[in-house]
Amino acid sequence: MKTLRLIGMAVIAVIMSVNFAACSDDDDDTIDTSSLEGTWGLVRSAGWELCSEETEKDTWDYTNDPYNPDYDSEKIVIKKLSDNTYSITSYYYSGSDWQMDGSQTGTLDGKTIVLKDHDGWFEYANPVIETLTTDKLVLRIKYDLSL
């Protein structure tokens, strides 16, 4: 359960910048996908989940330095395969080396990455892009056990 929590929800806040970027309030459901491809290291993960009995709420909020990885470090590599299809490969840091955790493909529907397979990092969720710039990617994950 801890691994699932760390792997799945860690992507809530995949951020590659230590700079603050202010954006105008925009309700547009489209994004500029030209910045989506690349390697994105986890900077902050925050969230909560209900335990199996749904009586206890487990919360977490931790930070990582993607430039100095340690045992909690994670990253994803996003590559464009065709016009609207992307591969997402996830990695975790183990010892002194990055280990592949899984690979998925998906398409963009507005700001949502609709995954074709759910056996990788986003096992129970289709991530929603909250922020995307050339140096910052913020994803929101809401688990959906029906996937």
Segments (PLM) and residue ranges:
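Bacterial N-terminal signal peptides that target proteins for export
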Residues: M1-A10
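Bacterial Sec-dependent N-terminal signal peptides
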Residues: T3, M16-V43
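N-terminal compositionally biased, intrinsically disordered segments and leader/signal-like regions
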Residues: L4, S34, W40, E56, ...
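Short consensus segments that form the blades of beta-propeller domains
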Residues: T30-I31, E56-N68, G95-D97
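Tryptophan-anchored aromatic micro-motifs
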Residues: D32-D61
